[in-house]
């Protein structure tokens, strides 16, 4: 009898232990559900080189702890590679342009030869003279002329920024600034998640590669998305894709937005539209060398809304007209809801300008909160 009693007690204790464990698991599951429901998941989409990864970097600067000294040092190689890619692209394009461009100073020929023959090698190790040669060559009139024609070949947006500071980038004690890190271009391949909180609200931002071969991965991120942030580089109206020289970059972005907007899995997911690289668009419009109507003929007859011109009356009217032309082009794509419950919210952005992104993201937070409440049928 004693043995039987002990056995019953042991069974009872085991059952209680299992019950307690189950309760703990249920509590954890409930907590995870609450955390999941209280988290705003933002999916960053857009064509390659539109500025998506720069937006993520801004979130780190604004809402996390920015970049540590170690992380800044880790970016040095990527920044120097940007510098090398820039000078190699410009020097290499001189002879292939129609008409071709010659160096202004014949003594710079040996510098260009060094760039094309030595600096372009895969195992190049960035000796001190490379940065000196970059700085000298960058001042050559022929190199500058080739740079001005960069829409005729492929050149990273940060080329001028890093070539202007070639000697600084090459200094032994160089530590990148936040602006250097924002400008640095690194190809995004795969899916990267960034978590941050703003006023006790949790955000998960997913950055997905924008090149065509990367887009098949996008569907992996569609589940439980609060909102899509679609990033389009308006300044690329006179440029073609790296992966398809027959396709205009802005037209690719328009087609890409249309495919997202009309996707049957996303008919209830609203889009926050970042019309990005407004700084570069302004520069191109003011320079007057690449006319928008050459690439978008209907721009010739486009008139910006009167209230828009009045609101921006202190700015150059042609720049304002260009901005809102591209805004309206993208809004045309989203004018038909196709039976869905989604909306498009456009914003003019400059991803390398921290204050601009702070302002825009603050404006978006209320929109994102409403989308989140609607998603869980609380609104």
UniProtKB/Swiss-Prot annotation:
This is Guanine nucleotide-binding protein G(s) subunit alpha. InterPro entries: Gprotein_alpha_S (IPR000367), Gprotein_alpha_su (IPR001019), GproteinA_insert (IPR011025), P-loop_NTPase (IPR027417). Residues 41-54 are annotated as: G1 motif. Residues 180-188 are annotated as: G2 motif. Residues 272-279 are annotated as: G4 motif. Mg(2+) binds at residues 53, 188. Residues 38-379 form the G-alpha domain. Coiled coil: none annotated. Guanine nucleotide-binding proteins (G proteins) are involved as modulators or transducers in various transmembrane signaling systems. The G(s) protein is involved in hormonal regulation of adenylate cyclase: it activates the cyclase in response to beta-adrenergic stimuli.
């Amino acid at each position: 009898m004693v043995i039987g009693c002990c056995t019953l007690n042991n069974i009872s204790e085991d059952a209680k232990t299992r019950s307690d464990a189950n309760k703990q698991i249920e509590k954890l599951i409930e907590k995870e559900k609450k955390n999941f429901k209280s988290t705003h998941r933002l999916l960053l989409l857009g064509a390659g080189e539109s500025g998506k990864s720069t937006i993520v970097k801004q979130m780190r600067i604004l809402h996390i702890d920015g970049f540590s000294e170690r992380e800044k040092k880790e970016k040095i190689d990527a920044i120097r590679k940007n510098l090398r890619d820039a000078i190699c692209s410009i020097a290499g394009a001189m002879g292939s342009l129609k008409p071709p461009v010659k160096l202004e100073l014949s003594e710079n020929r040996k510098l260009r030869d060094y760039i094309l023959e030595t600096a372009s090698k895969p195992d190049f190790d960035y000796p001190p003279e490379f940065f000196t040669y970059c700085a000298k060559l960058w001042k050559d009139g022929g190199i500058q002329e080739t740079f001005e024609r960069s829409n005729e070949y492929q050149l990273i947006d940060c080329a001028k920024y890093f070539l202007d500071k070639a000697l600084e980038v090459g200094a032994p004690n160089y530590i990148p600034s936040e602006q250097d890190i924002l400008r640095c271009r690194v190809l995004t391949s795969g899916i990267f998640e960034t978590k941050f909180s703003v006023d006790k609200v949790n955000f998960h931002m997913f950055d997905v590669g924008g090149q065509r071969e990367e887009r098949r991965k996008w569907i992996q991120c569609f589940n439980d998305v609060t909102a899509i942030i679609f990033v389009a580089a308006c300044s690329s109206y006179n440029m073609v894709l790296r992966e398809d020289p027959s396709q205009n970059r802005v037209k690719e972005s328009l087609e890409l937005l249309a495919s997202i907007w009309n996707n049957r899995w996303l008919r209830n997911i609203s889009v926050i539209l970042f019309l990005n690289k407004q700084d570069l668009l302004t520069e191109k419009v003011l320079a007057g060398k690449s006319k928008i109507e050459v690439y978008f003929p209907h721009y010739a007859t486009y008139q910006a809304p009167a209230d828009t011109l009045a609101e921006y009356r202190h700015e150059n009217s042609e720049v304002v007209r260009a901005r809102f032309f591209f805004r309206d082009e993208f809004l045309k794509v989203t004018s038909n809801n196709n039976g869905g419950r989604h909306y498009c919210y456009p914003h003019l952005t400059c991803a390398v300008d921290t204050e601009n992104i702070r302002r825009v993201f603050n404006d978006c937070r209320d929109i994102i909160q409403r989308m989140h409440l609607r998603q869980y049928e609380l609104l």
